[in-house]
Amino acid sequence: MAMRQCAIYGKGGIGKSTTTQNLVAALAEMGKKVMIVGCDPKADSTRLILHSKAQNTIMEMAAEAGTVEDLELEDVLKVGYGGVKCVESGGPEPGVGCAGRGVITAINFLEEEGAYEDDLDFVFYDVLGDVVCGGFAMPIRENKAQEIYIVCSGEMMAMYAANNISKGIVKYANSGSVRLGGLICNSRNTDREDELIIALAAKLGTQMIHFVPRDNVVQRAEIRRMTVIEYDPTAKQADEYRTLARKVVENKMLIIPNPITMDELEALLMEFGVMEEEDESIVGKAAAAEE
């Protein structure tokens, strides 16, 4: 099969890296050849696959070596569980420079060094938070990733971020081949969460590709720096990630999304009881004034 390049976006803290690594572990278990490119200065996109605290990043090693041209592919590419290839782009120290530049530098380096030529089935880009700047949009802006999956939950800000990311996809979809493959609901156990994300997906013109339930085995595995697939392959949660992997492999629904307005998003949240009807009479009133 031709190599598929997928980017995983979503609100910060939503569980993108955990979801991506468990999905990738399930793909590796299926016999797929996969590479993860971490596009986040935290460099935590590969820790569960490599059983390490944080992988040395391309930007760190380039700074030590002098320039990125002084690096070799084997310096930055590590192989972990199931033969998964792992690379972290990294970024500058907090408050210094543009982390998005790290993503651009890393992907260009990997291309020049032939990292993509090794009969890979999938490349996954695990991308920082929202599409916050042009650098982080690089995997979709430069037509590197053709498929985008957005990790979200039934919480308002996660849905707001999913809608914002959809706007970013539209911006680049019209001039390139990038498409939205679906929403992955990483459950926070909010009320009617699966129905809400199915409804949001329908409004965006996409699908909820899978609902990943909340399970404490994920945290138990993470403490050991392992995916659930490796830590407890018999766990029900491991089967959830296997189902997600199978759905991604079989996914043919790749669309240009139809982002909604803030008013439409709020109306959806009110419909499902996540947000109360707006009452102008209470706006700006402190608790003491309401007594």
Swiss-Prot record:
ATP binds at residues 10-17. It catalyses: N2 + 8 reduced [2Fe-2S]-[ferredoxin] + 16 ATP + 16 H2O = H2 + 8 oxidized [2Fe-2S]-[ferredoxin] + 2 NH4(+) + 16 ADP + 16 phosphate + 6 H(+). One of its GO terms (molecular function) is nitrogenase activity. Its cofactor is [4Fe-4S] cluster. It comes from the Bacteria. GO terms for biological process: nitrogen fixation. Binds 1 [4Fe-4S] cluster per dimer. Its EC number is 1.18.6.1. It is an enzyme of class 1 (oxidoreductase). Coiled coil: none annotated. The reversible ADP-ribosylation of Arg-101 inactivates the nitrogenase reductase and regulates nitrogenase activity. [4Fe-4S] cluster binds at residues 98, 133. Belongs to the NifH/BchL/ChlL family. This is Nitrogenase iron protein 1. It comes from Azotobacter chroococcum mcd 1.
